[in-house]
């Protein structure tokens, strides 16, 4: 893992060139960001909190050993944007720009589509597990 000072330098250079986040935001260290996200999840409904906690924990664990500074910066910047969405209450209104969608692989787009469909089922009250139980009676 690279040092914090080197990481911040790379992040500032990358952010200024690509407009990742505004000038008033600074990059949070990974552990602090992780803890703030988990605290912010307490504001979510129980189902979203549970799903969010599991996802955040697995993603941070998977990215623990990354050494590429640009990957680290992109990862932390994306999660910091997510944190701002949750703390501002805009998590339900989030949408992807066409530019972000174009950068995704076909596999990622497929996963996103499946997630969208499952989310729609939950918000509409359709629960396939409940339906299976009803058919057995």
UniProtKB/Swiss-Prot annotation:
Domain of life: Eukaryota
Protein's GO biological process: carbon utilization; gluconeogenesis; mitochondrial respiratory chain complex II assembly; regulation of gluconeogenesis; succinate metabolic process
UniProt keyword Transit peptide, yes or no: yes
Subcellular locations according to the entry: Mitochondrion matrix
Transit peptide: 1-15
Keyword terms of this UniProt record: Chaperone, Gluconeogenesis, Mitochondrion, Transit peptide
Upper classification of the organism: Eukaryota, Fungi, Dikarya, Ascomycota, Saccharomycotina
Name of the protein in question: Succinate dehydrogenase assembly factor 3, mitochondrial
Subunit details: Interacts with the iron-sulfur protein subunit within the SDH catalytic dimer.
Keyword Mitochondrion assigned: yes
Pfam families for the chain: Complex1_LYR_2
Entry's family note: Belongs to the complex I LYR family. SDHAF3 subfamily.
CDD domains: Complex1_LYR_SDHAF3_LYRM10
Function: Plays an essential role in the assembly of succinate dehydrogenase (SDH), an enzyme complex (also referred to as respiratory complex II) that is a component of both the tricarboxylic acid (TCA) cycle and the mitochondrial electron transport chain, and which couples the oxidation of succinate to fumarate with the reduction of ubiquinone (coenzyme Q) to ubiquinol. Promotes maturation of the iron-sulfur protein subunit of the SDH catalytic dimer, protecting it from the deleterious effects of oxidants. May act together with SDHAF1.
InterPro entries registered for this protein in UniProt: SDHAF3/Sdh7 (IPR008381)
Entry's Gene Ontology cellular component terms: mitochondrial intermembrane space; mitochondrial matrix
Region Disordered, residue ranges: 117-137
């Amino acid at each position: 893992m690279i040092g914090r000072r080197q990481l911040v330098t790379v992040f500032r250079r990358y952010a200024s060139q690509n407009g990742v986040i505004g000038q008033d935001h600074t990059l949070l260290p990974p552990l602090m960001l992780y803890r703030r996200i988990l605290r912010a999840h307490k504001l979510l409904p129980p189902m979203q909190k549970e799903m969010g906690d599991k996802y955040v924990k697995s993603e941070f664990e998977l990215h623990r050993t990354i050494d590429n500074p640009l990957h680290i910066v992109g990862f932390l910047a994306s999660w910091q944007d997510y944190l701002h969405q949750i703390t501002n209450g805009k998590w339900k209104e989030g949408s992807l720009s066409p530019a972000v969608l174009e950068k995704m692989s076909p596999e990622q787009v497929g996963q996103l589509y499946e997630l969208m469909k499952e989310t729609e089922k939950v918000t509409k009250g359709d629960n396939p597990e409940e339906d299976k139980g009803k058919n057995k009676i």
